[in-house]
Amino acid sequence: LKPYFEESTGQLFTSGIKVLVKVTVQFHELYGYSLTVLDIDPTYTLGDMARRRREILLQLEEEGVLTLNKELEMPVLPQRIAVVSSATAAGYGDFCHQLKHNSGGFFFYTELFPALMQGNQVEESVLAALDCINARISEFDVVVIIRGGGAASDLSGFDTYLLAAACAQFPLPVITGIGHERDDTVLDSVAH
């Protein structure tokens, strides 16, 4: 069932996710009850993830902060870029390469504010990086958050209320490059 679930949902079968399973229950006088999982419904888990994203976006909208970052004026040519990413991320390397070899010959200053881009500490790590940038806000034109593609569960750290609220209200435009083009996180929805 695990491979079926992971292939169907694009996320790892780990603790903390909600699942809907079909089971049989048996009773043995000596050993007691036993439960056998017969099937799993991956659409239930996908629905729960989508519901959580909708609830966060609705809460941000009710608080009046959902579109605040989008309303900030974007510099015509943002040249001082604070990057939140992992130093070893391929996406970060690709981003820097594209800036360095741009067809216009423009110079861009980038500074990396390292953060974890996967796992249970994504929210805390990215928020800490944003705090560091905020302490030096006058040195930058924009913030870019970069995390390459992966399984849907790998991107769940970007679907949190605290991180979305912080980015929505950040005083600089926040640009996201999270996951593949088809991926959509709460953070993408609030970013510039």
Per-range role (PLM):
Residues 2-21:
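Short nucleic-acid-contacting surface segments enriched for D/E, G, S/T with interspersed K/R
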Residues 82-192:
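Short glycine/threonine-rich loop/turn motifs
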Residues 20-55:
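OB-fold/S1-family single-stranded nucleic acid-binding modules
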Residues 32-42, 75-79, 186-192:
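Acidic/polar active-site rim loop that often engages polyanionic ligands
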Residues 20-24, 65-71, 98-99:
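Short, charged beta->alpha transition segments
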Residues 43-75:
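Short N-terminal or domain-adjacent regulatory/targeting segments
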Residues 15-17, 29-31, 75-77, 89, ...:
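Short flexible coil/turn linkers enriched for glycine and charged/polar residues
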